């Protein structure tokens, strides 16, 4: 999965000292403009951190990609949020 991090357009957020990662994930998903939103490696329905990517080009195309990152066989898989909502509570 490509990243916009080198251009300063990605951020990883951890709600350790404020809102929970679930609250961050759902707030961004429901209220903000983004290109890619990833709930990273949830445990017991709680993401370990939240990855947000912004791209003006993709925003013009009205793209919003929401994923859940999981580890499987030592590899990271990005599952579409739709159909896997049960992994995030």
List where the protein language model places each region:
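Catalytic cores and adjacent binding grooves of peptidoglycan-active enzymes
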Residues: 2-9, 15-89
């Amino acid at each position: 999965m490509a990243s916009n991090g080198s251009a300063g357009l990605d951020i990883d957020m951890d709600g350790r000292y404020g809102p929970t990662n679930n609250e961050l994930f759902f707030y961004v998903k429901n209220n903000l403009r983004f290109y890619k939103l990833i709930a990273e490696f949830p445990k017991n329905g709680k993401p370990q951190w939240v990855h947000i990517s912004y791209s003006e080009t993709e925003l013009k195309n009205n793209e919003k990609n929401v994923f859940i990152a999981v580890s499987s066989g030592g590899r990271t898989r990005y599952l579409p949020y739709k159909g896997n909502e049960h992994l995030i509570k």
